UniProtKB/Swiss-Prot annotation:
UniProt-recorded name of the protein: Large ribosomal subunit protein bL20
InterPro entries: Ribosomal_bL20, RIBOSOMAL_L20_CS, Ribosomal_protein_bL20_C
Any one annotated GO CC term: ribonucleoprotein complex
Keywords in alphabetical order: Ribonucleoprotein, Ribosomal protein, RNA-binding, rRNA-binding
MF GO annotations: rRNA binding; structural constituent of ribosome
Matching PROSITE patterns: RIBOSOMAL_L20
GO biological process: ribosomal large subunit assembly; translation
Gene name tied to this protein: rplT
SUPFAM superfamilies the record matches: Ribosomal protein L20 (SSF74731)
Species this protein is from: Protochlamydia amoebophila (strain UWE25)
C-alpha cells in the first residue's frame, strides 16, 4: 500500500512559512528548519515592538512638548499640571503636533496653562 503524505497540505504550510520569510538572507529564507525558527523569532520581535512603539511615541511627544514649552518659558511638568488644572482635554499627541505645525496656537495654550497656575 502506498504511504499517504498529504502533500497538498504540507506544501501549503511550507509555502506560507517561506512567504513569511521573504526578505530574509541566506539559508534562513529557503531551508525549512532554519526558516521556521527565524520566522518564529521575527514574529516574537514583531509582537514586542508593536507594544514598544506606543511607549516610544509617547516619549517622543513628551520630548517635543518639553522643548516647545521651554521655548515659551515653562517646564514640561508645570505645563502639563497647568493644563490639568485648566481642565484642558488635549492629549500629548495633539499638543506635540501643534507645537511643531502651529507654534502660535501652542504659545496660546502655554499662556492658558500659565494662567491656570497663577
Amino acid at each position: 500500500m502506498v504511504r499517504a503524505t498529504n502533500a497538498v497540505a504540507s506544501h501549503r504550510r511550507k509555502k506560507r512559512l517561506f512567504k513569511l520569510a521573504k526578505g530574509f538572507v541566506g539559508d534562513r529564507k529557503n531551508h525549512l528548519r532554519l526558516t521556521s525558527g527565524a520566522v518564529m523569532r521575527a514574529m516574537a520581535y514583531n509582537y514586542a515592538h508593536r507594544k514598544q512603539k506606543k511607549r516610544d511615541f509617547r516619549s517622543l511627544w513628551i520630548m517635543r512638548l518639553n522643548a516647545a514649552a521651554r521655548i515659551n518659558g515653562i517646564s514640561y511638568s508645570k505645563f502639563i499640571y497647568g493644563l490639568k488644572k485648566a481642565q484642558c482635554e488635549l492629549d500629548r499627541k495633539v499638543l506635540a503636533d501643534m507645537a511643531i505645525r502651529d507654534p502660535g496656537s501652542f504659545a496660546a495654550i502655554v499662556g492658558f496653562a500659565k494662567e491656570a497656575l497663577a
